[in-house]
Structure formats: C-alpha cells, structure tokens
C-alpha cells in the first residue's frame, strides 16, 4: 500500500503524561479526595500504587507493592493513618531488602510487613539524606490524623525536588503543610479536595 503525505502546518497542543513520580502522588491525593481512580495505568510501579489504593478503598487484607519502593513507602504510612491494622504489605525480595527508614509499628512477616498499630499524631524525626519517599509518604499520611503533627529532618534533605512535588500535589488538593526551620508542621485535619 502506498500513501502520499503532503506538507501541512500542524497546530495544537499535546498534553504530556505526568512522570511516574508525579502519578504516585496524584493517585494518592485523588484517592484521599474521594475521586474515582483510573481503571489502569502503564508502568509496574504506578500500577502497584493503583492496585494498593483499590485494596484500601475496597477493604482487602494485603497490598502487593511489587518492586516499587515508592508504593511501599507511600502506602504503608497511608494505611496506618487510615487505621488499617493487620494489613499486610508484600513485595519482591529485593524490595523487602531495602530499609523503610522510619520507625513504623510494623511486624516483619511472610515476606512483607504487617501493620500492628495505627499512625498517631506527634513529632516524627527522619534523616533527610536517606530516601525522600519516606518523607513524602508521611507528608501525605499525617494530614489524615485528628491532631497536628510535625515532621523534622535530622540531616539535610538530598532529594528536595521530590518532596516539593509532594507538597505541590497536596496544595493542589487543598492541603496546606507549613514549612519550618527543620521540616514541616502538618495542621489537622484538612480535607483533601478534588484537583
């Protein structure tokens, strides 16, 4: 088959899909605002987050994080803030070798983590030179609690752009997080709103 192409001036705009990092945060904020979630997404990491959010919405007892560190580090504190004690988060052996970098009340069992207590309001101290995903996970989970909390960095933050991406997603969904000299203060309980 032969096709002829003729020169033409093209106009319009193309919406580029968000990055994987932005999608994780957007999905979580949509979930917390009570918005519908997409049916499916391309990419194993964001698909793991989408599946995990469905488990949280529908009341399942386990979340498979696959190989996604972001899914584990974002959904673990979120599930704790939602009071999902007993929930089991699993993943690939390689994922589960990586540290959580936060003192969460979880039990290590059956190739994963089981939540033993809910997340409570308070002061959380984290190292800023480890993964920013732990910081972002807490920034998205702490607004769900009934009282204010504080997130303090004990070392300088190395991945500020990812934390800024989280703060931007929260702002777009109606949640204000206050920046302090050493971290953030999270007033509670704000209400997540549709973007």
Description of each model-found segment:
Residues 1-195:
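Structural preference for solvent-exposed beta-strand-turn elements
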């Amino acid at each position: 088959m032969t096709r002829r192409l003729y020169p033409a001036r093209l106009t319009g705009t193309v919406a580029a899909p968000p990055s994987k990092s932005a999608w994780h945060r957007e999905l979580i904020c949509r979930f917390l605002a009570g918005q519908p979630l997409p049916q499916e997404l391309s990419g194993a990491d964001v698909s793991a987050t989408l599946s995990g959010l469905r488990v949280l919405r529908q009341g399942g007892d386990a979340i498979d994080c696959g190989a996604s560190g972001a899914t584990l580090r974002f959904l673990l504190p979120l599930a704790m803030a939602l009071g999902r004690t007993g929930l089991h988060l699993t993943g690939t052996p390689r994922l589960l070798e990586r540290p959580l970098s936060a003192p969460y009340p979880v039990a290590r069992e059956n190739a994963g983590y089981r939540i033993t207590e809910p997340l409570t309001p308070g002061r959380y101290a984290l190292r800023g030179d480890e993964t920013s995903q732990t910081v972002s996970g807490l920034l998205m989970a702490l607004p769900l609690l009934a009282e204010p909390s504080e997130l303090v960095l004990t070392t300088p933050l190395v991945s500020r752009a990812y934390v800024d991406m989280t703060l931007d997603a929260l702002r777009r969904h109606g949640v204000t997080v206050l920046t302090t000299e050493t971290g953030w203060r999270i007033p509670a309980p704000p209400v997540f709103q549709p973007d």
